[in-house]
Amino acid sequence: MAKVSELYDVTWEEMRDKMRKWREENSRNSEQIVEVGEELISEYASKLGDDIWIIYEQVMIAALDYGRDDLALFCLQELRRQFPGSHRVKRLTGMRFEAMERYDDAIQLYDRILQEDPTNTAARKRKIAIRKAQGKNVEAIRELNEYLEQFVGDQEAWHELAELYINEHDYAKAAFCLEELMMTNPYNHLYCQQYAEVKYTQGGLENLELSRKYFAQALKLNNRNMRALFGLYMSASHIASNPKASAKTKKDNMKYASWAASQINKAYQFAGRSKKETKYSLKAVEDMLETLQITQS
């Protein structure tokens, strides 16, 4: 097999810089990382200086993802020799156990890390990932709640907990998690959109009104969010047909739904009428508008 350096006519410095760029971008292009990284550590290890250790870690994680356990084990052994007793290296050992589906061994290892260092967030998150991989959502939820009691500012954990509650159809708790996220990220249109979707799923006039409000907020933050635009149409339409809504509320929401449908129509027209799938989409939007006109008349 041709070497990367020969195939693409690149120097080892350029390969090292590419690996750094992938780390900074948190790229999960495991095959490329393995190809470039394996050549770096086998041919140029002596030239890499202290960069060699972070590259070993990067290559090991990619190798696990790519199914190269031989390479992952080699990198792990090099790291163990250099950093015996390191919690970071122990966590990598646990990740290898996970890749081998030795989940009990991985959890025992993470528990030992946490006994020595209760603030080790990486080990806690790996335990949660295992529970999810095993389909044990209830245990993952419990672990995440315990984690958030200590690390309340971890936004990624709040979002993960919201997703787990949604999977368990516990929409009230999912909404609470998303409210926490919106308080710290008021300009994130995706959080507004997801919160609106949860309230829409909960149903009832009050939740539908909240849903419409947050779909509108998501659109205000990003006017190209088509999912929020469809959500605005759906929530406003349901409010307009809700028997508990007042006449004024019904009339107002009919206007909102009509506006949303017209915006959807414009978006599809802008995408071009030549595409077959676009024509079907346009027909669906036109049917929406026709339904609104019938309801209004």
Swiss-Prot record:
GO cellular component, one term: endoplasmic reticulum membrane
Database matches in SUPFAM superfamilies: TPR-like
Membrane-topology annotation of the record: Peripheral membrane protein
Residues bearing the modification N-acetylalanine: 2
Keyword line: Acetylation, Endoplasmic reticulum, Membrane, Repeat, TPR repeat
TPR repeat start and end residues: 87-120, 155-188, 192-225
Cited function: Part of the endoplasmic reticulum membrane protein complex (EMC) that enables the energy-independent insertion into endoplasmic reticulum membranes of newly synthesized membrane proteins. Preferentially accommodates proteins with transmembrane domains that are weakly hydrophobic or contain destabilizing features such as charged and aromatic residues. Involved in the cotranslational insertion of multi-pass membrane proteins in which stop-transfer membrane-anchor sequences become ER membrane spanning helices.
Protein name: ER membrane protein complex subunit 2
